[in-house]
Amino acid sequence: MLFSSINFIYYFLPALLLCYYISPKQFKNYILLIFSLVFYSWGEPIYVFLMIFSAAFNYSMGNEILTYQQSQKNPKPTLIFTVIVNIFILSFFKYYGFATDIVNTVFRTDFHTTPLPLPIGISFYTFQALSYIFDIYNHKVTKHNRFIEFILYLSLFPQLIAGPIVQYKDVENQLRYRTVDMQDFGYGAERFIIGLSKKVLLANTLGSFHNMVIKMPESSQSTAAVWIGIICFTFQIYFDFSGYSDMAIGLGRMFGFHFKENFNYPYISKSVTEFWRRWHISLGSWFREYLYIPMGGNRVSPLRHIFNLLVVWSLTGLWHGANYNFILWGLYFGILLILEKYFLFRILDKISNKIRVCLTFVTVVISWVFFSSETATEAFSYLGKMFFFKGIPFANADAHYIFASSILIIMISAVCSTPLVSQAFEMLKSKKAIFANFILLILMILSTASLIYTSYNPFLYFRF
């Protein structure tokens, strides 16, 4: 079940809100847990048991590590065992087929595999479970917790499918003691509507234009057309994912949870380094805290620092999917970050901020070619068309049509990807709140109409 669906908005969510707010305080976590499991089971009736196993296993291992620490015993073997089991489960479902393909290629074997459906949200809830284990080991979580609190932490439906990746220490108190006032609920509803409209009105529209370019006969894919297509995808993935994060943050606030922001206008970044401080913040924080810093971070020799960055970014790419494209995508950013650290910043510091923003944006646009393509061959072919290496025309009639059809939504998206719209809306709220609420109502009506009358409603991060 997606947040951007009629079933969720007009059936599931009202039923949950009613049950949650009429139930006594001591039952609220149980209500949330039941509905979260139903939410997950809607699309994964079998794999819900895998998530429950993950919760039970990591909860028991966390308690064992705590017990060892309190009795002055060495908990490291338990930590290593727990990490191995989590990584094995994630790898089995996510990378089994990819690993078999690599073995077949390297050793010229012919092993056949039956494709396994990927459990929804497994990358997210596995990373949350690991952060809980690491935080216990590092004495950042120091008390035994009730199982209901831990399984709710892993399965809580707002952030279950697509994040943000929540650390236990950030919501530990909220799982036990939380309150919701009208201001919290109103803010949550506002964030949900804004996220829904970003997803449905912007991302879905942009995605239809990107699909139009992808499905063109190759002879019709001019340089201008493929640039328009990947620019549409660039804004699509931002509004798709940030819109879902907005909805998750808003839903969490309706039930008293304060999740951290996951995006901070990444397309206004003046460098790739800054971009990754603004894009998918919770994932970047996870890798930095639990992998990059333990490896030594930047407090090591330049060669070791470069090695650390390449490892972290290879794994960041691999986290997104079992495909060479994602590894290349991660390495692309890793190499750019290394170049910025040791060379490019000296040049960038001499360039105006506006030019830096444009250069960074183009750099990020190029990266999405790897992300949006099915294979590495397809990605490099697309890049060849972008940079005139394929002997195709710069523009043709199809390119003119797509440009004329998409230019308005691209311009709207460009403005909405900056703080300008948010600042204007906040100013309107402070002076004429009724008009701001009217805008939210219109956005909700338009989003609902779009969901009813159009069938194109993908979610790009759903597969991770």
Language-model region placement:
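Membrane-embedded transmembrane alpha-helical bundles that form the catalytic cores
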Residues: 1-417, 423-463
